[in-house]
Amino acid sequence: SSVFHPNNESFCCSLFEHQTAMRKNRPFSRLKDFVVIPEFWALPFAEKCLEQNCGYAIFVQNGYLLNHGVSPEDYERLKKVYNRANLILSISDDTTEIIRIAYPYIEPQRIIRVTPTIAEGFVSSKKEKIISYMPRKLAEHSQKLCFYLKENLPNNWKLLPIENLSEQQVAQTLGHSSIFLSFSDQEGFALPPLEAALSGALVIGYTGQGAKEYFNSPNFIEIQN
């Protein structure tokens, strides 16, 4: 298998370590290739697969992005590429429900639930009095909550934003955090809350809908958004 970036053939993801082979040429072979397309690129690139008579799957990592960047007049084209897909890969139970609502004619056996992988580095370390959160998630909500919490926290507790960090640094921060505030919003699965819980933190906040399937006590406390 290999990864092909249609807009940048020299692209190589640097957000995490990997040894993935990168493909630098097209078109695809009807006999040799099977293409997996993320949902936000489904319309333009699934259509190209149809033109080349090449098998493909659409990987829906966030059901709330099914029509992202697609104008209403192109919804029938989008419907066609989902209808003609060999498989639809779904990241969560919530995402599967959304797919079935949007495209009820798709046979259930063509929708395959996949399970995300969590990096091995997300483990509990020596806990400190740290409440961590990711400010890029619902920034206005996190800013307001931090404002109200600031004067009410004991002096030996601190609020720590997680931003502009490598995966390893995020894992280290979560490992030392006692509490993680979740501001997930319209998420396909929402990995950060799960990573925080696996790192031994108590997770408090929003499920973003996608995390509902694992947001259970005693590791999680759900707050309605």
Language model segments and positions:
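Conserved catalytic-core segment of nucleotide-activated headgroup transferases in glycan assembly
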Residues: 93-170
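Aromatic "clamp/platform" in nucleotide-sugar-dependent glycosyltransferases that forms part
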Residues: 185
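Short glycine/proline-enriched, acidic/aromatic patches that form the donor-sugar handling elements
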Residues: 189, 209-214
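Short hydrophobic beta-strand element within catalytic cores of glycosyltransferases
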Residues: 202-205
